[in-house]
């Protein structure tokens, strides 16, 4: 037999080529797995060529390392056939590992086919020598080489399948796996070479007319380095592009989540908004139908929030809403839905097997929300009115439940606020009436349906008249003359009272100017300020503008503020009243005796008169307690140098008693009913 030898440098180079080819194959397997459609096919074809060229190159580098004492060459046709076998086996391997699953039966069949393909590539490449006589193969070494090829292929397929998805340490893991696979491929090659025996006298039929060793060396090295380098460079560039795409996708996903959050949640409190609440309500209805469940809708409105907002500004109002939302969250279960509809309206969707479940929660919320808030160094107090609608008794649809819960909430407000109320069918009619009345009220200002009537104020006991109180009336086209008690509460609920109050102030100043021009220089006019109007940030400017607009001296205008309104936030009230007083406007504390005034604050208030509440006047002749209270109020007013006005005087006995106590002026039906301006002038002519 001819004695063969190996170039150790080329043997080492063949191992390096095998490892690089293995790493390229593993990387390509990952690319094919991540890609889809035509992109996946492109990676599969490119990966098959890169891996096939790598294995083929390793084989022929190993052949270059092999030498015999005779000239050697390689048949071009068989050499190309061996290359095709290597590429085909690689394509099959990549396709196999990119499947969703790789059961052991498929793995075994794939290992057998791929191992056979690699072995066929090897022995076809050996056949390209065209040895005469033919190469003699040792059966044991031949079988061992094929077995190694099959086992190595199985290991390569399993490793590639396991590493097809990326991880943080994927480069190191693939490098280790490529080392194992490269050693296995090289082991198969050199085991196959060990099986080959060349008889003495043999010669290479391809020498001189095939590819000689020199050209083969150049061809193999150039092709090997070019293909593997191109494959790895493309893979690295794609990996970077993929990383950037992944970052972009992550950013887009985060932005999408934020957009969904903004679309479905209130930006201030982070609670679900109306859109998400509607969806939750629909789901609750479907689940209730399916599972025969019951649930409740609680419609909550904050009492006094607008006054806080106007008095302290929107920033503090926003902080208050956030705190209210936190208090609600702390008192409900995780599975319950809390939504903010806007402004100071909240809706709760809760599971309620019995009405008592909803009542218990409503009572707890009313108590919790009415507790004081410490916000930006201010102590703020509000309350909550809650309406409750139960499914299915109070509504079968989302719209019905919301409408009925809202109607129950307004009923709770009508009952005194700071409480809750279950929906009753009778509320619907009232709700419709209130809605229509509100619609008409919004148009009343535009259509000049609001008018002022004037009630005389006279010096005790019988006059003369020293002024009037302006009282609002609504001349409704269908319902006739409507008194303030019927529509002002609705105006306060909706905030329309501020706009109405500004109109009253302007109209009163206009009328007072006409009376002054008519020679009644000793008259003044009193205008009531609602709680919302008093707390409104533009009140002082509104008063100043009305006076300037009608060229009215401030001393002819008296602003009446109820005791409870003035004392709601005494420090803030003091600032407002001092600004009005500095302007020259008279200040009257209305309904005095019904609130909770501190004598210290009362002394500091720049008021010019106290107005005794009519509730104390009604029972003067029969109730000694009321008489004692009125006597005390008169004495207090004298001590503070305030004028005392008694309203609601309807009998001569009341007139005489109040005069005897020392009231400065009187007002009531006995002395004159509220009347239009023309009628008032006629009565004093």
Curated annotation (Swiss-Prot):
Entry binding sites for Mg(2+) 2: 590-591, 647
Catalytic activity from the UniProt record: 2 GTP = 3',3'-c-di-GMP + 2 diphosphate; 3',3'-c-di-GMP + H2O = 5'-phosphoguanylyl(3'->5')guanosine + H(+)
Cofactor requirements of the protein: Mg(2+)
UniProt-listed Gene3D superfamilies: 3.30.70.270, EAL domain
Transmembrane segments: 9-29, 44-64, 77-97, 117-137, 141-161, 175-195, 214-234
Binding sites annotated in the UniProt record for Mg(2+) 1: 469, 528, 560, 590
Protein name listed in UniProt: Bifunctional diguanylate cyclase/cyclic di-GMP phosphodiesterase MucR
Domain GGDEF intervals: 293-425
Principal localisation: membrane
Role according to the record: Displays both diguanylate cyclase (DGC) and c-di-GMP-specific phosphodiesterase (PDE) activity. Probably modulates DGC and PDE activities, and thus c-di-GMP levels, in a growth mode-dependent manner. May act as a PDE under planktonic growth conditions and as a DGC in biofilms. During biofilm formation, it specifically activates alginate biosynthesis via generation of a localized c-di-GMP pool in the vicinity of the alginate biosynthesis protein Alg44.
InterPro entries: Biofilm_reg_signaling (IPR052155), EAL_dom (IPR001633), EAL_sf (IPR035919), GGDEF_dom (IPR000160), MHYT_dom (IPR005330), Nucleotide_cyclase (IPR029787), Rev_trsase/Diguanyl_cyclase (IPR043128)
Keyword Protein biosynthesis: no
Cofactor note: Binds 2 Mg(2+) ions per subunit.
Subunit structure, interactors included: Homodimer.
EC number: 2.7.7.65, 3.1.4.52
Location in or out of the cell: Cell inner membrane
One of the record's GO cellular component terms: plasma membrane
Organism placement in taxonomy: Bacteria, Pseudomonadati, Pseudomonadota, Gammaproteobacteria, Pseudomonadales
Residues of the MHYT domain: 6-199
Encoding gene per record: mucR
Gene ablation phenotype (knockout): Deletion of the gene in the mucoid alginate-overproducing strain PDO300 results in a nonmucoid phenotype and an about 38-fold decrease in alginate production. Inactivation of the gene impairs biofilm dispersion in response to NO and glutamate. Deletion results in increased swimming motility. Loss of the gene does not influence swarming motility.
GO biological process: cellular response to nitric oxide
Domain of life: Bacteria
Positions contributing to 3',3'-c-di-GMP binding: 455, 469, 472-473, 528, 533, 590, 614, 650, 669
Keywords associated with the record: c-di-GMP, Cell inner membrane, Cell membrane, Hydrolase, Magnesium, Membrane, Metal-binding, Transferase, Transmembrane, Transmembrane helix
Cytoplasmic side: 235-685
UniProt key word Cell division: no
């Amino acid at each position: 037999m001819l004695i063969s030898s190996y170039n150790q440098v080329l043997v080492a180079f063949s191992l390096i080529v095998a490892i690089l080819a293995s790493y390229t194959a593993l990387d390509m397997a990952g690319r094919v797995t991540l890609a889809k459609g035509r992109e996946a096919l492109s990676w599969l074809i490119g990966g098959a060529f890169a891996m096939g060229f790598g294995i083929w190159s390793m084989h022929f580098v190993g052949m270059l390392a092999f030498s015999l004492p005779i000239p050697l060459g390689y048949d071009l046709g068989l050499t190309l056939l061996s290359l095709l076998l290597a590429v085909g086996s690689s394509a099959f391997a990549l396709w196999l590992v990119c499947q969703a699953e790789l059961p052991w039966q498929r793995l075994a069949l794939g290992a057998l086919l791929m191992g056979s393909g690699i072995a066929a590539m090897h022995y076809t490449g050996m056949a390209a020598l065209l040895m005469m006589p033919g190469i003699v193969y040792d059966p044991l070494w031949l079988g061992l080489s094929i077995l190694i090829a099959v086992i190595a292929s199985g290991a390569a397929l399993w490793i590639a399948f396991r590493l097809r998805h990326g991880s943080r340490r994927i480069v190191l893991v693939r490098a280790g796996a490529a080392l194992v696979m490269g050693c296995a491929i090289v082991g198969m090659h050199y085991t196959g070479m060990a099986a080959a025996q060349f008889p003495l006298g043999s010669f290479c039929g391809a020498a001189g007319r095939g590819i000689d060793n020199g050209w083969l060396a150049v061809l193999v090295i150039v092709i090997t380095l070019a293909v593997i380098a191109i494959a790895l460079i493309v893979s690295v560039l794609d990996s970077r592009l993929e990383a950037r795409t992944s970052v972009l996708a992550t950013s887009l996903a985060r932005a999408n989540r934020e957009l969904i959050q903004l679309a479905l949640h209130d930006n201030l409190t982070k609670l679900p908004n109306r859109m998400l609440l509607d969806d939750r309500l629909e789901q609750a209805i479907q689940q209730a139908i399916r599972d025969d469940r019951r649930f409740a809708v609680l419609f909550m409105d904050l009492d006094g929030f607008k006054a806080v907002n106007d008095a302290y500004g929107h920033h503090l109002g926003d902080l208050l809403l956030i705190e209210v939302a936190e208090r609600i969250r702390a008192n409900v279960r995780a599975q319950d839905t809390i939504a903010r509809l806007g402004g100071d309206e909240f809706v709760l969707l809760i599971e309620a097997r019995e009405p008592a479940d909803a009542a218990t929660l409503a009572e707890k919320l009313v108590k919790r929300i009415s507790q004081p808030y410490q916000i930006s160094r201010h102590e703020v107090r509000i309350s909550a009115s809650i309406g409750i609608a139960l499914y299915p008794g109070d509504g079968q649809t989302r719209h019905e439940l919301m409408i009925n819960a809202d109607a129950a909430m307004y009923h709770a407000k009508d009952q005194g606020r700071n409480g809750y109320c279950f929906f009753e069918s009778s509320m619907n009619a009232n709700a419709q009436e209130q809605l229509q009345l509100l619609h008409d009220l919004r148009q009343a200002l535009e259509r000049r349906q609001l008018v002022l009537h004037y009630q005389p104020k006279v010096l005790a006991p019988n006059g003369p008249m020293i002024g009037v109180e302006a009282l609002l009336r609504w001349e409704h086209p269908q319902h006739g003359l409507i008194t303030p008690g019927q529509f002002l509460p609705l105006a306060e609920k909706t905030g329309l009272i501020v706009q109405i109050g500004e109109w009253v102030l302007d109209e009163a100043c206009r009328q007072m100017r006409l009376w002054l021009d008519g020679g009644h220089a000793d008259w003044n006019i009193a205008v009531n300020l609602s709680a919302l109007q008093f707390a409104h940030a533009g009140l002082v400017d509104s008063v100043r503008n009305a006076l300037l607009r009608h060229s009215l001296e401030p001393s002819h205008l008296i602003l009446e503020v109820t005791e409870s309104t003035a004392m709601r936030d005494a420090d803030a009230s003091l600032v407002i009243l001092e600004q009005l007083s500095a302007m020259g406007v008279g200040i009257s504390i209305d309904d005095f005796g019904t609130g909770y005034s501190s004598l210290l604050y009362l002394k500091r208030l720049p008021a010019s008169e106290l107005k005794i509440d009519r509730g104390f006047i009604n029972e003067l002749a029969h109730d000694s307690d009321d008489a004692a209270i009125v006597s005390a109020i008169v004495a207090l007013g004298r001590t503070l140098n305030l004028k005392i006005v008694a309203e609601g005087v309807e009998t001569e006995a009341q007139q005489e008693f109040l005069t005897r106590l020392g009231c400065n002026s009187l007002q009531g039906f006995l002395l004159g009913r509220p009347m239009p301006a023309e009628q008032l002038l006629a009565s004093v002519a």
